[in-house]
Amino acid sequence: MSTPARKRLMRDFKRLQQDPPAGISGAPQDNNIMLWNAVIFGPDDTPWDGGTFKLSLQFSEDYPNKPPTVRFVSRMFHPNIYADGSICLDILQNQWSPIYDVAAILTSIQSLLCDPNPNSPANSEAARMFSESKREYNRRVREVVEQSWTAD
């Protein structure tokens, strides 16, 4: 059955394959267009450099009118990422707009890695460290990056 959400996701997938943003990949899981796996590579020349971070995106039939549920599957240490991998990002909540596609969502999350918002912490320890001890914060991020190489 082809619904508006499924048609839109097929378009998003085609666009992502034809013109992938740097450091991002994503595709539907098996034969389910409503459930995607994605990978964000840590941006160059940042503490996240070299990391490979896996995410899952769950879409509803209300997409693109409602945002997907996005979670990091990889372990993360970041002010705006909860312990369960869910992400505190305005475009995934109150600032969502149907103009955002999968590429825009993943690009925004990649940007968030390097530009956290410590005023809206999902991980208070990471937010405190980011604000008070950038060196220690960067060390913890590097640990997460190294773990991303061996995680399955």
Swiss-Prot record:
It holds the Pfam family UQ_con. Its EC number is 2.3.2.23. GO terms for molecular function: ATP binding; ubiquitin conjugating enzyme activity; ubiquitin-protein transferase activity. It comes from the Eukaryota. Expressed in all tissues examined. Lower levels found in leaves. Coiled coil: none annotated. InterPro entries: Ub_conjugating_enzyme (IPR050113), UBQ-conjugat_E2_core (IPR000608), UBQ-conjugating_AS (IPR023313), UBQ-conjugating_enzyme/RWD (IPR016135). Keywords: ATP-binding, Nucleotide-binding, Transferase, Ubl conjugation pathway. GO terms for biological process: protein ubiquitination; ubiquitin-dependent protein catabolic process; vegetative to reproductive phase transition of meristem. Induction: Not induced by heat shock. It catalyses: S-ubiquitinyl-[E1 ubiquitin-activating enzyme]-L-cysteine + [E2 ubiquitin-conjugating enzyme]-L-cysteine = [E1 ubiquitin-activating enzyme]-L-cysteine + S-ubiquitinyl-[E2 ubiquitin-conjugating enzyme]-L-cysteine. It is an enzyme of class 2 (transferase). Residues 4-150 form the UBC core domain. Pathway: Protein modification; protein ubiquitination. The active site is at residue 88. Belongs to the ubiquitin-conjugating enzyme family. PANTHER family: UBIQUITIN-CONJUGATING ENZYME E2. Accepts the ubiquitin from the E1 complex and catalyzes its covalent attachment to other proteins. This is Ubiquitin-conjugating enzyme E2 2. It comes from Arabidopsis thaliana.
